[in-house]
Structure formats: structure tokens, C-alpha cells
Amino acid sequence: MTAVTYRTCPRTGLQFEGNAEKLMIANAFVAVVFLLIGGILAIGVVLTRWPAIHWLAADTFYQVLTAHGIDMLIFWIIFFEIAVLYFASSTLLRCRLATPNIAWLAFALMLIGAITNNVAVFQGSSSVMMTSYVPMMAAPSFYLGLILFAVGALIACFVFFGTLVVAKREKTYEGSVPLVTFGAITAAIIAVFTIASGAIILIPTFLMSVGLVKEVDPLVYRTVWWAFGHSSQQINVAAHISIWYAVAAIAFGAKPMSERVSRGAFLLYILFLQLASAHHLLADPGLSTGWKVVNTSYFMYFAVLASMIHALSVPGAMEVAQRQKGLTKGLFEWLRKAPWGNPVFSGVIIALFGFGFLGGISGVMMGTEQLNMIIHNTIYVPGHFHATVVVGTTLTFMALTYFLLPVLFRREMINPGLAKYQPYLFGLSMYFFCLVMMGAGTLGVSRRHWDMALSGAALGYEWPGAAYLMMGLVGIAGMAAIVGGGIYIYITVGSLLWGKKLDSGAVSPRFTPVPQAMPGTALQSTGSSGFVAPGSFALTMVFLAAFVLYYFINWKYLSQVWGLS
């Protein structure tokens, strides 16, 4: 058994247990590799959906789209989230990692599964999209890879829970766990439900692919699979909001406005957030109207309430901390004088606004049973989830990486001037990408069809010029975002390869108290800051007004399709 050691970061005061630190580095590094693969594949997707270029042949397009979706939505994000779980438990609670050997087994299963799945897709026999709906079948190794990955991720979640038990037993913290750790617990609980759902439905599908099971009912498959496919985004929501609170503490020394309320919002996520999966099933005939109405109204309102709480609490915490430093002029001096040149802060704040205004509002609209019919299975849907997964989650993870490069990887960032602008290029390009994609979807452009012009089809359809314009803008904005993602890869990998090695800090056989003056203190503490945040309240009211306006605009759109005379 490897001896337990703790390395104290001289820049933050955070302490990294040796085994946990190696696992964080391994999971985060592999995550970035899959982000790179998915980003390269995105070039093919974007240039094919751009009508003026229409690059790839149909077979190649669906192969590339399958790999892009799985690598980005599953492998990149979950590998990174496992690293976040280990950080939120071992580092923030200053304890040893439970069962490091089993944690390495989990990592190996995830890596083998991800590689197996990618090989199956690139061999050309598994272009079934990420959803892989039955009875359309992929190669057995496609399903086997996903199952191995799911099992590994589940094991990693239980290692995280075990680490919480270790911290409690060894009394490495007093009182409640920090809010960031509480948010990570929320993400892990949702992850167990989500990943288990994926494994439950993929196992019989795998057996069907090898001939041991005759049939998997398509409606059962869709219902259970979406408990995995969409609920994986709910893991992301809990994880990236936890990181928002972490960055507020790191950048400003901020505490949540009310820790109890923020924890209550995370609890609402556990109870209700994954029910948002229902919007994918609203056109399915096998589910009752009552089930659809309850899931898309009453239950969804609790999840929306939780998100509104975080929408006020995260910027509010930053505002309170800034006002305590004397930045009290008007509503927004605290925001104007925030560290906009720091990519850790700018990445998070761009992610926060984009996730709320683009992903959140569009998600509530899509989750309303009647309104969903306007945009169901149109390209509006990927416009929405790029606003949540790419703007909200991926940009947040990028911002956290800039913090972790010197702290966890112990490397000085190369080209900090370029890093300063990367969140703006990536984030604002994705803002525009999502907006025009949702606009094209509102006009009815198909979600996945290789050729929006339906060339050669017996029954063609002539889209309005605005639809072609918007899809062209999707291509331009998408390529700009890919450049922004490439800059992130260059800075991250380049810093690991060529960045100056930084002082590792002292190593000791046990954890030690964090000095009060260090940034890690705020990250590991508990407590509330108060409610004096008029600027954040004003921003929240603007968000609410935008939400109400857009919601009723879509009811107007819906009324226009009713005429039958």
C-alpha cells in the first residue's frame, strides 16, 4: 500500500493527497484528450451542416456525428467530473482517498470502455448516433465500451462516497462539508442514477447485438435511455454550479448569500432535476398525458426554482464580496471592476450568463408539453444543449483548468495573454452559434438530417431564405468556437509540455490547517455572506423578464400553427 502523503500548494494553501492527486491528473488529462478528438470531429459536423459547404458524404457525416456526440457529451465531461469529485472530497476535506487501487481500476475501465467505443464507431459499423435507438443496431463492442465506461464511472462515484466517509471518521473537517463539496455530492448522487440507467438498458441491447436476446422494446429503450442521456446533463449542472461557487471563493473570497438556501437548491436538483428528461419523450405515444403533464409542469417548476436560486446566489456572493472591498458605487461597479482579464473568472461569468439566458430559458420552453411540439426533433434541440453543455459546462471546466494548471499540475501557463481572450472567443462564438441554431430550429430545420435541402427526395421542401442564412451563420460561429477550443487545448497541453515547473510545496505525512490568508481558506469554509446584492437582484429580474417574454412569444408561435381553414 502506498504511503499517504499530503502536498501543500504554496500558492493556494490547498493540500493534495498523493494518490488522489495522481488520479485527478490522469482523469483530467484523458478528458482533455477526448475534448480534442471531439473538437476535431466537430469540424466535420459544422462544415457539413453549413449549406454552402456541405462537406462530408452522408455515411461519413453520421459516423462523425456519432463519435462527436459520445466523446463530447459523455467521455470528455464525465472524465473531468470524476477529477472534480476527487478534488471536492480529498482536497477540500483534506483527507486520504478511499481505496486508491479501486479508483485506478475505475479509471482503467472508463478508459478501456471509451477507447473500445471509439474504435467501434470509427470502424464504420456503428453510426447509430449517441442515442443508438433500437432496433437499429451497432457492433457489440459499441455497447460493451459504453457499459465498461459506465461501470468504471459508477465505481469512481462510490470511491468518492467512500472518501467522504473517511473524512468524517478521521474528523478532517468540522461541522458541515463545504458548499462546493455538497454540490459535488449532489452531482454524484445524480450520476449514480444516471449511469446506472444507461447500464441497465445497454446490457440487454448488447445481448441483443450478439444474438442472446431477441428483442428490446423501442419504447422501453427510449424511456430508460433518456434517464441516462439527458440526466447526464443534470450531473453537469450540479458539477459546474459547484465550480461557480468555488471560483467565487477563489477569485473574491466570497461566501454564498445563504448557505442553507443554496444547499436546499442542490437538494431540489436531486429530487426533480433529472425529470427534465421527459421533454425527449413528449411525442412518444406509450406515456400517459398525466405523466407528461406532471413531469413538464409541477415537478419541473421545482428544478427551475433551484436554478433561479443559484442564478441569484452565485453572482450575489461575488457582489457582496466586492462591496465589502469598497466597490459600492451604483448597481454594477462591483461587476465592472471584476477581474475580467483573468480567464478563471471571465470563463465562469460567461458560462453563467450563457447557461441561464440561452440554455435555461430554452430548456424550460422545450420542457413545456404544448410548446415542445413547435421544436421537437428540430435543430433547436442541439442549439439548446450546446448552450447548456458547451457554454455552461465545458466553458466552466476550461476556466477551472486555468486555475488548476499551477495548483494541481504545477506548471506556469504558457501564453497568458492568449489565455485572457480564449473564454471570450469560445464563449461568445457559442452564444451566437446557439442563438442562430435555435432560430433555424424555430423555422423547422431538422435536428440530424445530413442535407437540409433534401436533395433528390421525392417530396422536397423549400425552406425560407432565413433558414439557410441561419444555418450558414451556424457554420461561421461554429468554426470560430472550434478555434477558441483549439486555443484552450494549445494552452493546456502546451503548459504541461513546455510550461515552467513551479514549486510543488511542502510534503508531509498528514494534513495541516490551511493558513487563513490563503485562497484555499474560503474554498474550504462554510457560512453565509448576507443579502445586500442589488446588482445581482437587478440582473435576476432582467433574466426573469427575458424568460417571461420568450415564453409567451412561443405561445404566440404555437397559436399560428392552429389554423386549419
Label each PLM-derived region with a short phrase.
Residues 550-565:
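Juxtamembrane boundary at the C-terminal end of a transmembrane helix
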Residues 524-544:
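Juxtamembrane cytosolic/matrix-side boundary and N-terminal portion
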Residues 72-73, 236, 541, 547, ...:
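Residues in flexible loops and secondary-structure boundaries
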Residues 2-518, 536:
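Membrane-embedded and interfacial regions of multi-pass energy-transducing membrane proteins
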Residues 349, 428, 538-554:
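Final/C-terminal transmembrane alpha-helix of multipass membrane proteins
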Residues 519-523:
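Intrinsically disordered, low-complexity cytosolic tails and juxtamembrane linkers
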